Amino acid sequence: MLEQNIKKVLYSEEEIIVKTKELGAQLTKDYAGKNPLLVGVLKGSVPFMAELMKHIDTHIEIDFMVVSSYHGGTTSSGEVKILKDVDTNIENRDVIFIEDIIDTGRTLKYLRDMFKYRQANSVRIATLFDKPEGRVVDIDADYVCYKVPNEFIVGFGLDYAENYRNLPYVGVLKEDVYSK
């Protein structure tokens, strides 16, 4: 049923898991003995973060934030709103934001700057997908699984109007679905 709205599959579940394992190995190496705090940016980060955690072989803690700059549409409103903040004190902590996709970059730039202000020891960004063509602010992720074209993609946590997050793969949504 959902597949009928997908123009093409970009990455299969198996391909995503392979990249996530590679990233987990890199984070294990980079954070050995440091107990970093992984902060998932809800809701889209859930499948990626759940898969990634299985492949990090060092102590970690997790927390979550609900942050929005889209408010249900396909384009960023430009205004970042924190709907749920972390519960963990991040002062002197190594923080890794876990995100499904970086598009405009507004949300993660805002969060990175805020956590630096709150005196985190370090702030890094790990994203499943990076869409550099969509960037409107100067920010880059420290860890990127895939760079993607400037197309509207869904699946593996990525949504359109809260739908399609449950697809096990990532695909391009047909334009007629979101241009109605």
From Swiss-Prot:
Protein's GO biological process: GMP salvage; guanine salvage; hypoxanthine metabolic process; IMP salvage; purine ribonucleoside salvage
Per the record, GO CC terms? cytosol
The alphabetized UniProt keywords are: Cytoplasm, Glycosyltransferase, Magnesium, Metal-binding, Nucleotide-binding, Purine salvage, Transferase
Q: Which residues bind Mg(2+)?
A: E99, D100
State the Gene3D superfamilies in the record. 3.40.50.2020
Reported cofactor(s): Mg(2+)
Tell me the InterPro entries matching this sequence. Answer: HGPRT, Hxn_phspho_trans, PRibTrfase_dom, PRTase-like
- Root EC class: transferase
Kindly list the cysteine pairs connected by disulfide bridges.
none
Residues binding GMP, per UniProt:
K131, F152, I153, D159
What the entry lists under SUPFAM superfamilies is as follows:
PRTase-like (SSF53271)
Q: Catalytic activity annotated for this protein?
A: IMP + diphosphate = hypoxanthine + 5-phospho-alpha-D-ribose 1-diphosphate; GMP + diphosphate = guanine + 5-phospho-alpha-D-ribose 1-diphosphate
Give the UniProt subcellular location, in the record's own words: Cytoplasm
Pathway field of the UniProt record reads: Purine metabolism; IMP biosynthesis via salvage pathway; IMP from hypoxanthine: step 1/1; Purine metabolism; GMP biosynthesis via salvage pathway; GMP from guanine: step 1/1
Catalytic positions are D103 (proton acceptor)
**From the UniProt record, which GO molecular function terms apply?**
guanine phosphoribosyltransferase activity; hypoxanthine phosphoribosyltransferase activity; magnesium ion binding; nucleotide binding
EC number(s) stated in the UniProt entry for this protein: 2.4.2.8
Q: Which residues bind diphosphate?
A: K43, G44, R165
What is the similarity comment for this entry?
A: Belongs to the purine/pyrimidine phosphoribosyltransferase family.
Job description of the protein: Purine salvage pathway enzyme that catalyzes the transfer of the ribosyl-5-phosphate group from 5-phospho-alpha-D-ribose 1-diphosphate (PRPP) to the N9 position of the 6-oxopurines hypoxanthine and guanine to form the corresponding ribonucleotides IMP (inosine 5'-monophosphate) and GMP (guanosine 5'-monophosphate), with the release of PPi.
Q: What is this protein called?
A: Hypoxanthine-guanine phosphoribosyltransferase
